[in-house]
């Protein structure tokens, strides 16, 4: 299945009324809120491990309230939320990770271990649940990497407010988050004096995206918002040029040694900023004119907003990430 067809499928599924799942409906098992699961993933090409960092209760659940079991759970990894003691599976999604990319690099193949921070967004449970994160082999076999129970009343679940000082603008709002695909354009490398540029970029790329298929025919089921925390410096790091910038997300060219690969390892900062608006997926819009970007499935994508191929980069990298 192509990425475009996958987008169409997810948008269509989100419009179908809630149907029975397991032993009940969405409201029987989940609140209309988000459980943010932060974890660390570490190892090398031959070994990998996961460890829980923290749990956070955030705002409204942006995902669908029906079809919580992904019919096509692509990706190197999978997360499952189940009733305790081997009960029904209540939620399931496939995903990729930054560490999954690292495992294919030269340093990882020579045994150099690295640790990276990751996040999953889940519907917030009404009762105690079991959460399992597993690696998936090409043939479909799974290896459990970490599993734990979550008590929604537990004091270990943080409930602080999202990062302050963040600007949120509407690019295109079609409806309720449960019934729409919610895309957040998170700005990177925009200073306080460049917020108007960020707002113009959000509107420009919203218009472009919704003019192309499959998004054009599904625009009544897509919400797009812009989210930005001003950066001290404009632009992003370019290590091979000796250019270093203090920015909100710490994004950098030359990720994993590839000149055009543009990613961020500051996942917690990214998620703290993005939490100011409901989202299913993140597009990091970088204030730069150099050709570059990247995309991780069900994580995020990046693209540079001011080069001659910016529109192509957005559509291409979004296809990798969602």
Which functions belong to the PLM regions below?
Residues 235-237, 267-301:
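Catalytic zinc-binding patch centered on the HExxH motif and its immediate surroundings
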